[in-house]
Design a protein with these regions (language model features):
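Feature detects long, helix-prone N-terminal segments enriched in hydrophobes
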Residues: 1-70
Length: 70
């Protein structure tokens, strides 16, 4: 089994095949993660209306390294 990394990212948008996240609450520097690579996912409700929801996302370590996320 692959090693995984857990991140707290903000969800910008999602499709059937991928989710778009940002490390910033403002949505800057966004990136896509294929749903098939997300091993664990939990979306929290936004604290205030109009804010992006914060998510706990777990992905394979090799993917995080390849994308420069760690």
């Amino acid at each position: 089994m692959d090693e995984t990394q857990q991140f707290d990212w903000y969800l910008l948008r999602e499709t059937d095949k991928a989710r778009c996240f940002s490390e910033s609450v403002h949505g800057s520097d966004s990136f896509w993660v294929p749903r098939s690579l997300i091993t664990d996912y939990l979306k929290y409700p936004p604290k205030n209306p109009g804010e992006l929801p914060l998510c706990m996302v777990e992905v394979p370590e090799w993917f995080a390294e390849k994308e420069g996320l760690i």
